[in-house]
Amino acid sequence: MSQNVYQFIDVQRVDPAKKPIKIRKIEFVEIYEPFTKQQATAQADRCLDCGNPYCEWKCPVHNYIPQWLKLANEGRILEAVELSHQTNSLPEVCGRVCPQDRLCEGSCTLNDDFGAVTIGNIEKYITDKAFEMGWKPDMSKVEWTDKKVAIIGAGPAGLAAADILVRNGVKPVVFDRYPEIGGLLTFGIPSFKLEKGVMENRRRVFTEMGVEFRMNVEVGQDVQMQELLDEYDAVFLGVGTYKYMRAGLENEDAPGVYDALPFLISNTYKVMELEHNQPFIDMAGKKVVVLGGGDTAMDCVRTSIRQGASNVICAYRRDEENMPGSRREVKNAKEEGVKFMFNLQPLGIEVDAYGKVSGVKVVKTALGEPDDAGRRRPEPVEGSEHVLPADAVIMAFGFQPHQMNWLTPFNVELDQWGRIKAPNNQEFQYQTSNEKIFAGGDAVRGSDLVVTAIDEGRKAAEGILEYLNV
């Protein structure tokens, strides 16, 4: 690192360049250009190497951020990537999709006055560069056991669990209903944030490490849970949350109203040129209204732009300051032509004489007293009802645990919201009420960040290792 203690002043924060707007609006490719070696080195040099690194503590997996920034600054990429993998199973993913402004970069000492260190982009640079250099995990010292674990779900929690298990000599076999690994990383997050080749490469890495993938396999249909319990020493549930939430709006089942996840999955199948048993949902030429204010809503509005929608509106019931989505994603959406309408609460879906969507009836809101979560409640403004014209409406209200009938006979307790009970403060962390079954990620904590799912998958794997006495 630089000996100049004022390097953070001499070198200002610089984010990667973005592709031109006219290209971004039509292509499903990542919008950020990669850092050059010179850019990554200079930006890493801005780190103050704080004695108490708030960035590290704010990170859910507690990455060794100052240490790998120093290694990146010195050009020691292979050492940096080894260090990043000590805490994170998918650093190239987190570097792309984590809301760094709310996590590591938001906690950076330099953030308020000088601009935070570009931690996420350097994390991405380190891993991408290491893969270019031919890096792969060294498995030569692994002492293999005769233990094997079935992992249900190839999303971030399942992949993280597989990573820890295989590094400790336990054979992970991952089952997933989709044709490619990643879960919503692949089929939910659009390519302009996370290109599909990223997960394809990670699949090759995990396979070479000894992880076995059995794709296009639906538990409860293609394989039974009892078979897995009989054949494997333990089972990990990393099934995520796939039930999309509804608002109970009038006419929300009308033709032209879509839930966010089926819309995004449909688009991914088309982008990846995969066969799909559902028709493609196309927004070309349509006036689209997306209801919601989280990252999924941002994915929907930006996907609609790329599909060629004539007009795209994001309607959210609170103000911009209270949007749950990443500020970076909101900014990108605005640049690409999305119109945001804040303090609007949907009341119902308007339909024409044929029953098809013609608009969304909304009411203006004002923020009132805080709710139990500390967020100010949106309160309707009397007499402010009006209609937003629309040919298509996408509802992006979030996700909740989906029903798993195949799990019911196996004494796995759920909480009142349908989440799997798998406490982390017990003898074997993330063990369920069935001693042989462990769980982690969104299925346990509810819909959350990729990095929190990774964290729980890794910790659940540690619990499994202790349970198996490995």
Describe the role of every protein-language-model region.
Residues C300, A443-N469:
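A conserved FAD-binding loop/helix module that cradles the flavin
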Residues I126-E143, R204-Q221, Y244-Q307, Q416-F428, ...:
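Glycine-rich dinucleotide-binding loop and its adjacent helix/turn
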Residues S89, G155-P156, G294-T296, A443-V444:
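Residue-level detector of alpha-helix initiation sites
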Residues D253-G285, P370-S447:
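FAD-site-proximal beta/loop scaffold in flavoenzymes
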Residues R24-A42, Y64-R96, D113-E143, T268:
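Ferredoxin-type iron-sulfur electron-transfer modules in oxidoreductases and energy-metabolism complexes
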Residues Y6-E33, H62-E74, L83-H85, D112, ...:
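Beta1-alpha1 glycine-rich phosphate/pyrophosphate-binding loop at the start
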Residues D45-Y64, S89-D112:
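Local cysteine-cluster metal-coordination motifs and their immediate loop/turn environment
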Residues E79, E143-I152, E200-L249, G348-V357, ...:
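Feature captures the FAD/FMN-dependent oxidoreductase FAD-binding
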